[in-house]
Curated annotation (Swiss-Prot):
Main location: cytoplasm
Record protein name field: SKA complex subunit 2
UniProt xrefs under InterPro entries: Ska2, Ska2_N
Pfam families: SKA2
Amino acid sequence: MEAEVDKLELMFQKADSDLDYIQYRLEYEIKTNYPDSAGKKNPVTLLKELSAIKSRYQTLHVRFKPIAVEQKETKSRICATFNKTMTLIQELQKETDLELLPLTEEEKTAAEQLRAHMSDL
């Protein structure tokens, strides 16, 4: 498993390196083939801005990755707690011989949405 992770890491590093090379080549081609024209934004400047945006995206991705993991774990814990609660309620209803009323349309819709959401986890 760790070898696969290392292989993926190398693939991402190569892709990043390839993108840097492509950016360098584009900047060079633009500088040599298209001199700055008046009134238009310099394509090289646009590429540099794109590079800055890419860097900010990577930083955000690194910062929010742990948050996404924690969010997924929290959702799983909530679903587990919900399922336990529903099981407990059903057991209590059986033990007390409580007669259940049919669900309203709104309750049916909410239950369907909840089931769909829980299956996505």
